[in-house]
Swiss-Prot record:
It comes from the Bacteria. Transmembrane segments: none annotated. It is found in: Cell outer membrane. InterPro entries: Alginate_export_dom (IPR025388), Alginate_Permeability_Chnl (IPR053728). This is Alginate production protein AlgE. GO terms for biological process: alginic acid biosynthetic process. The lineage of its organism: Bacteria, Pseudomonadati, Pseudomonadota, Gammaproteobacteria, Pseudomonadales. GO terms for cellular component: cell outer membrane. Gene3D superfamilies: 2.40.160.100. It holds the Pfam family Alginate_exp. It comes from Pseudomonas syringae pv. tomato (strain ATCC BAA-871 / DC3000).
């Protein structure tokens, strides 16, 4: 298998750090190398809502993640690799969303083997060098390299990407400033970038202040510059060709009571965010021919002016039980910046749960979501969350963003499929029940600098399950239910 130069260089740097383990061991007294072993079983039925044969996932997988970390003075370095093998294309990594375009305009043209996810692959998740000498504060670090960008709500950043990122985290002030661009997936199966990531640059920053004990308020901004080439009208397209580009700016306000901290024992917790989107976007249509070829249509330019909000309240009934409600709304012209996962500790437990359903896995794009939940946590040994979601379209004649639902229709007599459009004028997307239960075994001993790199600080067994019932925005012929259940077992050495 031939690797592209960027992937080969990244893996070379990462494996060089792995081989340097004995040297790195002398640089710090903390545990600085190890391996995370993750076994996953997934059962998923009717992702396509019964619109074609197949669409089910039933498999088990093994995910090995060796890592190495070292520090000397103000300098540090880190790398994490990954080897995955499975009986089906299951979701061993929650960062990898099973999203499809809900607009009905995204067509699978079947010509992009470079983007086909395989059952087994090797990857390099992170490799970065850090410097912490700009200020005397221990929570300050500049990282350069492929790294995990993540914010508390997961709605702006939660991904591994090549970046230069400066973080400042103290008792009263948190700040971030950085730039990022994806150059490679660093995976043996995905040898080309997704079209949305090609030639797309990101600039971002945020600052929040603890204005009174336990209460934070802040601002954040993100700018995306995409100058990728769009094909001219009449040119043939494949799945690796971009169909949109443009320049977009997100500006947001946020306030919370440290609600994403599962150790927070405040009787009443809240969070709230309000974001504005502004910019321009060029898009080309896609037309198909009888011989299964696809061609670029007319290019259209439009202004993007949208907004989104996410609000939540959580009441602590006693040291173990909490109940709460959350509401999210994104206008028809709003989209997220593409670096999000929408996973966070919003139910008040250690488990990072998808804000828009473990089965539906929606995005903030012309979607309104109301959620009710109850959560339980016993010491640091167990936690559980039971969640109800109701999903609606804000504009009944406009598509939605990506989701874990992939209802399709066959294109005539060809062997290709495209997304099934939603019913015009109908807003009810459906409802869902989620259950997430976790048993923790032991606390991990990891360097503080790696808090963003690991989703879980300890060994565990976790069930993530969701049952989705589609609403009348989907066609009458679709199945009544779709479910997704994932069991993860994680251990560290």
């Amino acid at each position: 298998m031939k690797l592209n130069p960027l992937m080969a260089a990244g893996m070379g740097l990462g494996f060089t750090l792995f081989w340097a383990c004995p040297t790195l061991a002398a640089l710090t007294e903390q545990q600085n190398f190890g391996i995370e072993i993750k076994a996953t079983a997934q059962a998923e039925d009717d992702r396509d809502l019964g619109t074609r044969s197949g669409g089910d996932v039933n498999g088990v997988g093994l995910d090995l993640r060796p890592w190495v970390y070292g520090e000397r003075g103000d300098w540090s370095g880190y790398a994490m690799g990954q080897v995955v093998t499975a009986t089906d294309t299951i979701q061993t990594d929650p960062l990898e969303q099973s999203n499809s375009d809900g607009s009905g305009t995204q067509t699978s043209r079947g010509t992009a083997s470079e983007r086909e996810v395989e059952k087994s692959y090797a990857a390099l998740r992170e490799f970065w060098i850090g410097y912490s000498g700009f200020t005397p504060y221990p929570g300050e670090i500049l990282k350069v390299g492929r790294q995990r960008l993540r914010n508390d709500d997961g709605q702006w950043h939660d991904t591994n990407i090549e970046a230069i990122n400066w973080n400042f985290d103290t008792t009263l002030l948190r700040a971030e400033l950085g730039a990022a661009q994806r150059f490679s997936e660093y995976r043996t199966d995905l040898t080309e970038l997704a079209p949305d990531d090609e030639d797309r640059k990101h600039l971002f920053g945020s600052a929040s202040y603890q204005w009174t004990p336990g209460h934070w308020a802040g601002v954040r901004a993100h700018y995306s510059h995409d100058d990728g080439k769009l094909k001219s009208q009449g040119e043939q397209l494949d799945d690796l060709d971009k169909t949109s580009n443009g320049n977009l700016t997100w500006l947001g306000l946020q306030a919370d009571s440290d609600a994403y901290n599962y150790r927070n024992t405040t009787p009443l917790n809240y969070w709230g965010s309000l974001t504005w989107l502004n910019g321009t976007r060029d898009e080309i249509g896609v037309t198909s021919a009888a011989n299964d070829q696809f061609f670029a249509g007319e290019k259209n330019s439009r202004d993007m002016n949208g907004w989104a909000t996410d609000l939540g309240l959580r009441l602590r009934l006693d040291p173990q039980w909490q109940v709460g409600a959350a509401y999210s709304r994104a206008s028809k012209d709003y989209i997220q910046n593409g670096l999000e996962s929408n996973r966070s500790n919003w139910t008040g437990t250690r488990s990072r749960i998808h804000r828009f359903g473990e089965a539906f896995q929606g995005e903030m794009a012309n979607v309104e979501t109301g959620s009710l939940f109850a959560s339980w946590q016993m010491n640091e040994e167990y936690d559980a969350s039971l969640i109800y979601h109701k999903f609606r379209r804000v504009d009944g004649n406009t598509g939605i963003g990506g989701s874990g639902i992939n209802a399709v229709r066959e294109n005539g007599d060809s062997n290709t499929f495209s997304s099934l459009p939603l019913e015009d004028g109908r807003k009810d997307l459906g409802q869902e029940m989620d259950l997430v239960v976790t048993k923790y075994f032991k606390q991990g001993l990891l360097p503080a600098s790696l808090s963003q790199s690991f989703d879980e600080p300890s060994a565990l067994v976790r069930l993530r399950a969701g049952v989705f019932k589609p609403g009348d925005a989907y066609h009458n012929g679709v199945d009544e239910y779709m479910h997704r259940a994932v069991v993860d077992v994680i251990w560290r050495f």
